């Protein structure tokens, strides 16, 4: 399981700035009222992602199922949840894609655009990675490098995943700079 957390810093210039909140507000056990979270089930449509060698299930299918469950959980806690997809589709539009832009690049840019346009406070990009050696597999949460709030939330999520899944390999939350 891979989850990338990104705090979206851009807001339209005509929007009022959000009220300041302590970094721990994202991980408080209480309400998420007033927070907008974009949930991105990775891959979709033409892009299946990794495929399980044992079952033949595509990553895009598992990502979507997990994302829909995450949406329900976040909504129950009061968050406004935006979804990049709810079905097996990608975000490409071949009729408007410039010739020098790959389908994958347009799909990823559309995901970023949805977060910015939706004024998301956070992005959860959900992936199920494949490891050739089973003992290396396990959940891992990534956050934007330099984000204190992201680091705190990612650490909390990483601990919860380890507790819930009891993986052979206990990974740590890691910083990164990802283009979803």
Locate predicted features.
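Catalytic-site microenvironment of enzymes
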Residues: 1-180
């Amino acid at each position: 399981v891979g989850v990338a957390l990104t705090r979206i810093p851009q807001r339209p210039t005509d929007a009022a700035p959000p009220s300041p909140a302590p970094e721990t507000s994202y991980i408080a056990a209480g309400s998420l009222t007033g927070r907008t979270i974009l949930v991105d089930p990775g891959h979709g449509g033409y892009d299946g992602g990794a495929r399980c060698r044992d079952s033949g299930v595509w990553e895009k299918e598992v990502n979507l199922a997990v994302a829909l469950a995450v949406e329900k959980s976040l909504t129950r806690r009061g968050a406004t949840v935006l979804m990049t997809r709810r079905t097996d589709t990608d975000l490409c539009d071949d009729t408007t894609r410039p010739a020098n832009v790959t389908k994958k690049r347009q799909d990823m840019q559309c995901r970023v655009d949805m977060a910015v346009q939706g004024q998301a406070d956070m992005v959860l990009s959900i992936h199920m990675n494949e490891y050739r050696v089973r003992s290396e597999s396990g959940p891992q949460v990534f956050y934007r490098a330099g984000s204190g709030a992201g680091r705190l939330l990612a650490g909390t999520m990483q601990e919860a995943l380890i507790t819930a899944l009891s993986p052979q390999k206990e990974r740590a939350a890691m910083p990164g700079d990802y283009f979803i």
